[in-house]
């Protein structure tokens, strides 16, 4: 159990190190207006904090830096619960609304905004479209032999495929086929569409089958492609701005990891569903992130849990600001309506 004085000193050490990236000594702390203790008292408490594993001495300096344990204590006990700034959330909501009504563009914009607000790299994971349900099927003709099939999901995800007819198909046949599919298949999970369209073809009477079977089968072929969760990356190069990532030995593992989209997607999908959470260094369980902290949260659009967004920075990240900005973005996304 830390004394009130030790809490103040630990907070001051971490706050100072976050700002300067330089080890902190007792002399530096004694000059702070918010610490009215002598250098000797501060040195004694710093020795106790080091014995508890909350701070550590780097090889090349007389000062101290936070340890992973220290950062965890700081995040759990010294980072105050942030209150949503209604004015800031409103501004972010307006910026998201101006970007698009399509979920993919909104999520990408949210990732970019969060990166700009924090100066950290961000990753946003959209839903796996196979887990969504069909909202509607549309068709846009390009010419007499070609057109684009649009599959729109309940969460605003849009998949489009260009199709080519072997021979000209009458516009009324196309229109009626789309109507039949929408009447019978809206609400079907995307992953089951291929089977369901086949079932609907089998139900058609002979006269209908001659008219609509080819068109239905053509549309059926477009939904057979498995679509992974959408992944959006913001501010990838911002890691270059951090003093901890100025050498190839520290930078290369991070860049190689973040460039492997399949592995990155799997990692985000494996995170437990929860509100804002901070994982620090080795807690991430990934070698490339051993010098990083990650702030993650689920987010919602139109009242539905939509995906996960993560902010990645050094373990020396500004946790207060990061948690605050994550909360603002999550709230702005929650308030944004796709159909307005």
UniProtKB/Swiss-Prot annotation:
Disulphide connectivity of cysteines: none
GO terms assigned for molecular function: DNA binding
GO biological process: negative regulation of DNA-templated transcription
Recorded coiled-coil stretches: none
Matching InterPro entries: GAF-like_dom_sf (IPR029016), HrcA (IPR002571), HrcA_C (IPR021153), WH-like_DNA-bd_sf (IPR036388), WH_DNA-bd_sf (IPR036390), WHTH_transcript_rep_HrcA_IDD (IPR023120)
Alphabetical UniProt keywords: Repressor, Stress response, Transcription, Transcription regulation
Pfam families in UniProt: HrcA
PANTHER family the record matches: HEAT-INDUCIBLE TRANSCRIPTION REPRESSOR HRCA
Family note: Belongs to the HrcA family.
Function summary: Negative regulator of class I heat shock genes (grpE-dnaK-dnaJ and groELS operons). Prevents heat-shock induction of these operons.
Descriptive protein name: Heat-inducible transcription repressor HrcA
Gene coding for it: hrcA
């Amino acid at each position: 159990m830390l004394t009130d004085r030790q809490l103040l000193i630990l907070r001051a050490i971490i706050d100072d190190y976050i700002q300067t990236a330089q080890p902190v000594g007792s002399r530096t702390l004694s000059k702070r207006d918010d610490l009215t203790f002598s250098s000797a008292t501060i040195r004694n408490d710093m020795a106790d904090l080091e014995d508890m594993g909350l701070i550590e001495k780097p090889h090349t300096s007389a000062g101290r830096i936070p340890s992973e344990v220290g950062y965890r204590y700081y995040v759990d006990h010294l980072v105050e619960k942030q209150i949503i700034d209604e004015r800031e959330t409103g501004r972010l909501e307006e910026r998201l609304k101006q970007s698009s009504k399509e979920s993919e563009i909104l999520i990408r914009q949210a990732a970019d905004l969060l990166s700009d607000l924090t100066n950290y790299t961000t990753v946003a994971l959209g839903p796996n479209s196979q887990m969504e349900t069909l909202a509607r099927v549309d068709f846009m003709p390009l010419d007499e032999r070609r057109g684009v099939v649009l599959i729109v999901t309940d969460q605003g995800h849009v998949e489009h495929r260009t199709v080519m007819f072997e021979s000209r198909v009458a516009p009324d046949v196309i229109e009626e086929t789309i109507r039949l599919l929408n009447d019978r298949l809206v609400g079907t999970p995307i992953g089951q569409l291929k089977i369901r369209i086949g079932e609907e073809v089998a139900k058609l009477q002979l006269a209908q089958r001659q008219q609509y079977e080819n068109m239905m089968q053509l549309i059926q072929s477009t939904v057979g492609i498995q679509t992974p969760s959408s992944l959006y990356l913001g501010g990838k190069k911002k890691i270059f701005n951090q003093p901890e990532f100025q050498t190839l030995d520290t930078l290369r593992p991070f860049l190689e990891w973040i460039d492997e989209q399949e592995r990155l997607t799997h990692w985000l999908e494996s995170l437990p569903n929860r509100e804002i959470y901070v994982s620090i260094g080795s807690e991430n369980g990934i070698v490339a992130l051993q010098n990083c902290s990650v702030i993650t949260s689920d987010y919602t659009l139109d009242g539905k849990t939509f995906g996960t967004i993560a902010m990645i920075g050094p373990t020396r990240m500004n946790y207060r600001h990061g948690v605050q900005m994550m909360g603002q973005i999550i709230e702005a996304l929650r308030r944004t309506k796709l159909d307005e």
